[in-house]
């Protein structure tokens, strides 16, 4: 896992800060509820209680 991406993920996990994940031309908004492993994180948002994001498909990440 990239060190910069890990900083974003850990801050979201600790402080429930929102992130926008850009994945294959789509966006997924939410905050991290669990870092599963080096390539997968579990995210929660208003419409879904659990979303798995595969970091190997990640184009970009932005913090709200």
Q: Residues of each region from the PLM?
A:
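Short glycine-rich, low-complexity segments
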Residues: 1-29, 37-40, 44-64
């Amino acid at each position: 896992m990239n060190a910069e991406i890990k900083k974003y993920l850990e801050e979201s996990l600790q402080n429930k800060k929102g992130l926008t994940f850009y994945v294959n031309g789509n966006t997924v908004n939410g905050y991290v509820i669990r870092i599963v492993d080096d390539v997968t994180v579990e995210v929660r948002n208003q419409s879904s209680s659990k979303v798995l994001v595969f970091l190997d498909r990640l184009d970009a990440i932005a913090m709200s």
